[in-house]
């Protein structure tokens, strides 16, 4: 009963604060919702196509015109402009009007007809890795198609049948089979993994600010006294401020009235802020755990809903096993809970909301880069691997990709779910211990 009371009173305490502070409420409700929908809308075009390139045609021959038509027909690229000089083309690349330049050299057609090598020059802005890779693939495909057609026509003129000419031109073929994400769906590849990463950041920020503002405003003791049932007033800090202002106004009116009000104000302060030593000596870890659970129940519930929305959006069009969906959702909810507790730990450990937010940003913001989604995990340095192995987002994304995109057996990812659950429990216990330490050191409250 005592723990239930602590949970309910702490939840009511936090609900009242959120109702009176729209920005904090927005961090729980509207900002994560807008983030999820915005990221999904940004990647609504699931495939990259029609990347603009420029062309310098120095040959002006029918064969060069054929190459230009092939380039324009490629789904990956589109010809945005024809340039007359390399200088003009360079300006186009620098201004990002085009991402690459195809140069058709002089005597292109003559060299082909005479059987001499006739290269196509591709200059690509490799600063944009994804763009350049797609453009290189598209131009190489066009060049291969045109080259095959020219060679097969030459062999047919020599009396070889078209079928034999095709085999003679390319006796070894590559049969490429994409096992996962065969359509190169960037919404499935990037958006579905970026959303959990951003929710991870927001949850850590909320975790830091929810307990951090109690330290900053020197209200941690009042909060604990309220959840423990020693005070029946919900808005303790507000009542204290009002009584202080009234005391100051009465002092200006009359010294006798002021003395009386000062005595009342002093007794009121004594009742509101009972001796801190008496509070800290009787701090119960179980009550703290229940109070912290109630304090964080609203962001936990909200982010469980956003996790459900993220999983629903990330679910591929083809069927996914219910067990895989459930395991992924549980993993994401555990990641959100762990993020809340980690944010609280960083703030409580430093006794400073500012330091807690700094640590939160330092750890959560770049965690996606170390998770092995955009850059291969096996290719990073050993030091980066050790750092990646300490980040909870790394393990969740392994679970996410394995279950939703690779359809791996559930047993492959169960260890990650168990690990996240254990880490969440440990983080919650550590938060309670650090809260007890903070209650025992009131002289360190008030740091920004």
Where is each model-derived feature located?
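Short, membrane-interfacial amphipathic segments enriched in basic
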Residues: 1-11, 282, 383-392
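Extracytoplasmic/periplasmic domains immediately adjacent to an N-terminal transmembrane anchor
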Residues: 1-188, 240-251, 255, 261-272, ...
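Cytosol-facing boundaries of transmembrane alpha helices in integral membrane proteins
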Residues: 16, 179, 185-192, 196, ...
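Hydrophobic alpha-helical segments typical of transmembrane helices
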Residues: 63-67, 138, 207, 219, ...
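Short loop/turn hinge sites at secondary-structure boundaries
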Residues: 96, 114-116, 218, 244, ...
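Transmembrane alpha-helical segments that form the functional core of multipass membrane systems
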Residues: 190-248, 264-349, 353-368
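Membrane-spanning alpha-helical segments of multipass transporters and channels
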Residues: 301, 305-448
């Amino acid at each position: 009963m005592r723990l239930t009371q602590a949970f309910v009173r702490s939840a009511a305490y936090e609900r009242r604060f959120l109702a009176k502070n729209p920005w904090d409420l927005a961090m729980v409700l509207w900002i994560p919702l807008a983030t999820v929908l915005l990221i999904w809308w940004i990647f609504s075009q699931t495939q990259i196509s029609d990347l603009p390139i420029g062309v310098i045609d120095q040959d002006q021959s029918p064969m060069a015109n054929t190459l230009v038509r092939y380039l324009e027909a490629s789904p990956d690229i589109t010809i945005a402009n024809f340039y007359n000089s390399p200088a003009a083309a360079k300006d186009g690349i620098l201004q990002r009007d085009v991402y690459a330049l195809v140069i058709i050299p002089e005597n292109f057609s003559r060299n082909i007809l005479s059987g001499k090598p006739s290269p196509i020059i591709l200059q690509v802005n490799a600063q944009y890795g994804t763009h350049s890779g797609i453009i290189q693939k598209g131009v190489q495909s066009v060049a291969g198609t045109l080259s095959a057609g020219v060679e097969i026509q030459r062999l047919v003129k020599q009396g070889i049948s078209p079928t034999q000419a095709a085999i003679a031109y390319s006796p070894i073929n590559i049969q490429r089979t994409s096992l996962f994400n065969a359509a190169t769906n960037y919404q499935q590849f990037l958006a579905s993994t970026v959303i959990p990463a951003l929710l991870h950041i927001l949850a850590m920020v909320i975790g830091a600010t929810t307990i951090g503002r109690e330290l900053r405003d020197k209200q941690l003791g009042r909060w604990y006294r309220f959840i423990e049932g020693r005070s029946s007033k919900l808005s303790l800090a507000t009542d204290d401020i009002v009584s202080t202002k009234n005391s100051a106004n009465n002092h200006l009116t009359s010294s006798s009235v002021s003395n009386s009000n000062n005595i009342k104000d002093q007794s009121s302060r004594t009742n509101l802020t009972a001796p801190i030593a008496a509070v800290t000596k009787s701090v119960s870890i179980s009550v703290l755990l229940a109070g912290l659970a109630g304090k964080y129940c609203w962001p936990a519930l909200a982010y469980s809903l956003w996790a459900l929305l993220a999983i629903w959006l990330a679910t591929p069009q083809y069927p996914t096993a219910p067990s895989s969906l459930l395991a992924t959702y549980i993993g994401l909810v555990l990641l959100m809970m762990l993020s809340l507790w980690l944010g609280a730990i960083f703030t409580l450990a430093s006794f400073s909301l500012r330091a807690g937010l700094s640590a939160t940003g330092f750890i959560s913001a770049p965690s996606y880069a170390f998770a092995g989604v955009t850059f291969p995990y096996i290719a990073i340095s050993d030091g980066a691997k050790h750092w990646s192995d300490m980040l909870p987002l790394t393990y969740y994304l392994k679970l996410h990709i394995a279950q939703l995109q690779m359809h791996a057996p559930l047993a492959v990812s169960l260890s990650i779910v168990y690990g996240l659950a254990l880490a969440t429990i440990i983080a919650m216990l550590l938060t309670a211990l650090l809260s007890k330490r903070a209650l025992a050191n009131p002289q360190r409250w008030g740091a920004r």
